[in-house]
Amino acid sequence: MTIHRPPHVYLDDMRYFITAGTFRKKCLWNTKAKLQRLSFLLCEISGRYNVNLYAWVILPNHYHLLLKTLRGEDLVKFFRKLHSDSASYLNRLEDVRSRQVWYQYWDRCIRNEKDFWVRFNYIHQNAVKHGWTEKMEDYEFSTYKEYLDKNGPEWMADCFRRCPIIDFTTEEDNFQE
């Protein structure tokens, strides 16, 4: 078994910023129907494992989540189930056997409130950053529109003003093909 480097940290009652990418950064989630299925699985499985999703975005070759888990040990079960079910779906759909869909996931414990909101904003602008849309509100596979509809454009603009985005991209999580 390969050990993740750095090792995952599973803590109870903790908020995390998560990034997961497809194997070799391939755009496997490349249709609306596939993205809809992955977003459905994400929401359904998070409920089963007591994972509270604060914000998320799903792109054709990676996703980002901002979440909280009550029991740290549930996080590994959540990702195992999400990645297993989504890979099975995609491989069945495309009639491919035993293809590796996901590479790994990276987690980071949220340090403080500012860290939370900066990553909240980063998630919501990610589809624009990677060129999948010109406006955040036009991208369907994100919680941005949900927050916009619930809280209004002034609230969203204030989030971005108070906690500007920092580009967290490193070479290993640069998802440009």
Segments from the language model and where they lie:
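Short catalytic/metal-binding and nucleic-acid-binding patches
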Residues: 1-177
